[in-house]
Amino acid sequence: MVASRETLQDIAAERQLQPATLERVIRLIDILDAFGADTLIGPQIALKGGTALNVFHSDLDRLSVDIDVNYVGAIEKEQMDADRPGLEDRIERLMESKGYAARREPSEHAGGKWIYRYASALGGAGTIEIDINYLYRGPLYGVDRMPSAAIGSYQAKNVPVLDIHEIVAGKMVALITRRTARDLFDAHRIIAMPSLDWAKIKAATLMIGASAKSFDWRSASPAAIGCEVGDITGKLTMCLHDRYFDVFGGPPAWIENVTAECREKLAPLFQFTAGETAFLDGVLDRGDVDASSLDVPENVRSSIEASPALRWKAQNVKAWKSGDKSLAPRTRRAGRPRGETR
């Protein structure tokens, strides 16, 4: 599924999008369709992040151009270790069969990243990143098989996607810990989505936030929500329709209005009950994963306590407390974002 220059230009003109970004999304849809149809890859992964949100749970509000997936084949580390080489080899061979050239980034315990290069129909070359995370291999609310949004005649079918509440939770953690324009854009779209169960989102946010690398989720605050204007012009504008920010009065006005709205609507996520604070204290102060103080269903509590990501974080905390600085980086607490006045 490779769109021609003429097709890209026609769709881009119709949707007021940049042709090069549009081409990446069409290629991404083609790759995800192949992943979902593959009998080895499909059952072992679940799409998450901005692509899951914008390509599967909205009508391409923002063009997301990378593939972020969790391995979900098994929660047991031994089975994951056994599955990993075959899964990664199958992905590499599938991508090669579609004409992509890979550059593998250094592998880590938590996952691996590939940057795939392709010859663009518009001339020159483009890239697509595929990132596999192996720590979040226990989905909190399950995995759904879904079709993507359609771009002209291009659409993925039957793609494994994380439950929307866990996708949103990941976005909420990214909103605080990364503070990028794309996360702010996605958060603003999320607060307008109907029928979300915010109790489920908060539980997942606590799990993911407590697992965050080098961040103390107890310090998470609506005050950290926002982004820099340069991040919009450098990274977000290319993923939106032409002149998107004009109706808001320009990027600075958009940031001001959207930040205020998100801070107000999302504030309850950062108002921790005594039980939630006890859970976070256990993980971040003592390296104990005990979700008994959380007001969640028993199956969710069990899934949180079994989370490999949380257990890895707890192991690092214990190592740090014992004086072994090799495993755990110092955890930072959220402060006032740079460039923001009191």
Put a short name on every predicted segment.
Residues 1-45, 55-61, 65-67, 71-342:
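Structured mid-to-C-terminal alpha-helical surface segments
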Residues 50:
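Active-site glycine-centered loops adjacent to acidic/histidine catalytic or metal-binding residues
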